[in-house]
């Protein structure tokens, strides 16, 4: 993991074009090849990023760029598309690298882990014709609980929660934004699945085109014991 704090401007070129004017930002370079650009406020998600697989090249600035104060140019090129992230760095305030090793991954509580296993085994609960691709589909910003295909072969990303709230919807939204950049996956539809979904979360999800599914944990386990139900 490399962490660079720098004054820089950032341009994303590809299926979506976006530009961030010069400001002090955190540049995160991960071992999987992803590069993420963060600010110190506004949101906990990156302002822009390049998902793996990608290649980072550091270059000297052109004479015109140097005249404008640029000291180095980062070009992050996606390997599966023409998308690229261009970072023009004017000043590096900090540059640290750390070896983090292999991460064991997110450990869910017992019910959420069981819900994931059960839904993977009973994927038809999402609708007729759905098939499981895999559990814990890894992205540059974290694992999607379940990746599936619908009856038409479309990609479906499922976020599972014991109790579904707005944070869960925001999390799934970030995954969808990232995954829909991948031509091998897009278009990707989202499903927010939980034992109980708060009204505000349902409203936000539906506004963003995310389908909500309420799961009956006892029925999925083949249990119908009123005394042991959580809700």
Curated annotation (Swiss-Prot):
GO terms for cellular component: cytoplasm. Keywords: Cytoplasm, DNA-binding, Endonuclease, Hydrolase, Nuclease. It is found in: Cytoplasm. GO terms for molecular function: DNA binding; single-stranded DNA endodeoxyribonuclease activity. CDD domains: NucS-like (cd22341). InterPro entries: Endonuclease_NucS, NucS_C, NucS_N, NucS_N_sf, tRNA_endonuc-like_dom_sf. The keyword Lyase does not apply. Its main location: cytoplasm. Its EC number is 3.1.-.-. Belongs to the NucS endonuclease family. Cleaves both 3' and 5' ssDNA extremities of branched DNA structures. NCBIfam families: PRK03298.1. This is Endonuclease NucS. The lineage of its organism: Bacteria, Bacillati, Actinomycetota, Actinomycetes, Micrococcales.
């Amino acid at each position: 993991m490399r962490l660079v704090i720098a004054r820089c401007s950032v341009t994303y070129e590809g299926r979506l074009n976006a530009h961030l004017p010069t400001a002090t930002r955190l540049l995160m370079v991960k071992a999987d090849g992803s590069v993420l650009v963060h600010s110190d406020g506004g949101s906990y998600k990156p302002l822009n990023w390049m998902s793996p697989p990608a290649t980072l090249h550091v270059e000297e600035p052109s004479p015109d760029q140097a005249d404008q104060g640029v000291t180095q140019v980062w070009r992050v090129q996606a390997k599966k598309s023409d998308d690229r992230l261009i970072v023009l760095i004017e000043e590096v305030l900090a540059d640290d690298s750390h070896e983090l090793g292999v991460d064991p991954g997110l450990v869910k509580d017992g019910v959420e882990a069981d819900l994931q296993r059960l839904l993977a085994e009973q994927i038809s609960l999402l609708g007729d014709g759905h098939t499981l691709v895999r559990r814990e589909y890894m992205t540059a910003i974290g694992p999607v609980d379940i990746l599936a295909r619908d009856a038409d072969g479309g990609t479906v990303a499922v976020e599972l929660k014991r109790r579904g709230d707005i944070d869960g919807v925001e999390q799934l939204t970030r995954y969808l934004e990232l995954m829909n950049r991948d031509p091998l996956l897009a278009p990707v539809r989202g499903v927010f699945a939980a034992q109980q979904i708060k009204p505000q979360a349902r409203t936000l999800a539906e506004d963003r085109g995310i389908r909500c599914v309420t799961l009956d944990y006892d029925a999925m386990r083949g249990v119908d014991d009123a005394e042991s139900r959580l809700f």
